[in-house]
A protein has these predicted regions:
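Enzymes that bind and transform nitrogen-containing heteroaromatic metabolites
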Residues: 1-228
Length: 228
């Protein structure tokens, strides 16, 4: 259970109650949420992975959001660093964003048929071994890719992005983030770890606070939606 700080009334709620709210897709593309965890000083990975930052409630948030997601979109580096495998939700697909096609197609994520690639038109990828959604040249055009996800999952309504920071920055620049589900861990990490968006131009995107929750470990769980 978590304690709701915003909106009133201030009461205990379950993760499912807080996060399984309706998301309405856009006319020409699905709703895109970004789910991340960060330290108090902004690091999103410790030792190359985000798992060391979270706690059981943060994991429950991630799993709850995945349970209502049609497609997970994640960068190739995050897939390698976090050890992504096939999703637990039947029929769910995982789109791996790569500009160069440098992924291991023998990984179970792809051999299971759950994983597919999102790559530029000129990326060196064996289309006979893996399903590929091509958008852009040299670098992925994420807006085009998100708008064409229905070619992979016809009924797609909700997409969850899970990093890493380079993908987050590209989504930010393309103004594709409709929702930010951000856990702030009650710890400082120091070091030179990556921040939430790496390499993005300076941008002012405004969001509205949908809820703010806290747990007994001092973790803060926020959900913001894009002000449009």
């Amino acid at each position: 259970m978590l304690r709701r700080v915003h909106p009133a009334p201030h009461e205990r709620v379950t993760v499912a109650e807080a996060y399984t709210v309706e998301r309405v897709p856009h006319e020409h593309r699905p709703w895109v949420g970004l789910c991340m965890v960060t330290s108090l000083d902004g690091t999103v990975a410790v030792g190359g992975a985000s798992g060391g930052l979270g706690n059981p409630n943060d994991l429950q948030v991630l799993l709850t959001l995945r349970s209502i997601t049609d497609v997970i979109v994640v960068g190739a580096g995050t897939v390698r660093g976090e050890g992504y495998g096939p999703p637990k939700k039947p029929g769910q697909r995982i789109g791996v964003v790569t500009n160069r096609g440098s992924v291991d197609l023998d990984d179970e994520l792809f051999t299971s048929g759950a994983g597919f690639l999102i790559a530029p038109a000129d990326a060196d990828v064996d289309d006979d071994r893996v399903e590929v959604l091509r958008a852009g040249r040299e670098v992925v055009d994420l807006r085009v890719a998100i708008e064409r996800l229905h070619e992979i999952v016809p009924a797609v309504r909700y997409v969850q992005a899970e990093g890493g920071p380079t993908l987050n920055a590209a989504l930010l620049e393309a103004d594709l983030i409709d929702e930010l589900d951000l856990t702030v861990a009650s710890r400082l990490s120091g070091g030179a770890g990556p921040r939430l968006t790496r390499g993005a131009d300076e941008i002012d995107r405004r969001f509205d606070l949908a809820h703010l929750l806290v747990d007994d470990d001092g973790f803060v769980f926020g959900r913001w939606t894009r002000r449009r």
